[in-house]
Amino acid sequence: MRVVFMGSPDFSVPVLEALHAHHEVVCVYCQPPRPAGRGKKDRPTPVQARAEELGLPVRHPKSLRTPEVQADFAALGAEVAVVVAYGLILPQPILDAPDRGCLNIHASLLPRWRGAAPIHRAILAGDDETGICIMQMEAGLDTGPVLMCEKTHIGAEDTVQDLHDRLSGMGARLILGAIEALDDLVPQPQPEEGVTYAEKIAKAEAGIDWSRPAAEIDRQIRGLSPFPGAWTMLGGERVKLLRCRLAEGQGAPGELLEGLVIACGSGAVEITLAQREGKRPMERDEFLRGFALPRGSLATAS
């Protein structure tokens, strides 16, 4: 099938690779290169970089709303467009251009967690499961009817990165099945009950308040890892906490009990992966070997 692919970040790359292996990808749309790194040089998105390796034509318009861009899109003669974490809203002329419409791969169990950060929000909220939905796109934000859905359990120590990688592969597999069965699938309207929105993660959400219960802090650490990374002040430095587990122990909120077990308002968490400023992430034992933290030290919000 002639496919236009629209995506930008790492999450989208396995989907592009799967489509390229099984269909004719006539063009790839992604966000334009942006300044990144210490030199602030323009860096292409992961999708653009992979598309160019595969020899696929790439376009990165700043908007899809101009008549010229819409005419160019329609001229591709795509049978279907596949959209995953693209980064631009698709206006109606774009949605109408492919013969079979536009299919979106969304990383939640719709209608729960429509919007920009569904993986983060599922962990932060303490959800037991999440998944992938293949949706027929319409003008609303993630409101279209669902063609296919698959669930996955959220483990007690799963981070955003863990779910990101699992769901990305799941999305690549499901979209191939959806395209193959497109003539037989019956779009199911999303229920009106249970709608929630996954707002973008704000920087203010990353600072840890140790007076909160351990279960909440555990979800905060896992639900913000690796980006933006929940942080605390520890040993006079700002430290990102990237992996953890619930632990036994009591003490003053923020008190270092043993190793990297830190007391919370109720209960405690054990940090298993942490990152000092300017350093790479380190497992607990390696982190402690290079950072003297006496028992009773306090982790604080500022």
UniProtKB/Swiss-Prot annotation:
Entries under Gene3D superfamilies matching the protein: 3.40.50.12230
Amino-acid positions noted as binding (6S)-5,6,7,8-tetrahydrofolate in the UniProt annotation, renumbered to this chain: S108, L109, L110, P111
Highest taxon of the lineage: Bacteria
Record field: catalytic activity: L-methionyl-tRNA(fMet) + (6R)-10-formyltetrahydrofolate = N-formyl-L-methionyl-tRNA(fMet) + (6S)-5,6,7,8-tetrahydrofolate + H(+)
A single cellular component GO annotation: cytosol
One matching Pfam family: Formyl_trans_N
Keywords: Protein biosynthesis, Transferase
Any GO MF annotation of the entry: methionyl-tRNA formyltransferase activity
Signal peptide interval: none
Entry's EC annotation: 2.1.2.9
CDD domains the record matches: FMT_core_Met-tRNA-FMT_N, Met_tRNA_FMT_C
Keyword presence, Protein biosynthesis: yes
Free-text function comment from the UniProt entry: Attaches a formyl group to the free amino group of methionyl-tRNA(fMet). The formyl group appears to play a dual role in the initiator identity of N-formylmethionyl-tRNA by promoting its recognition by IF2 and preventing the misappropriation of this tRNA by the elongation apparatus.
HAMAP family in the record: Formyl_trans (MF_00182)
Family: Belongs to the Fmt family.
Protein name: Methionyl-tRNA formyltransferase
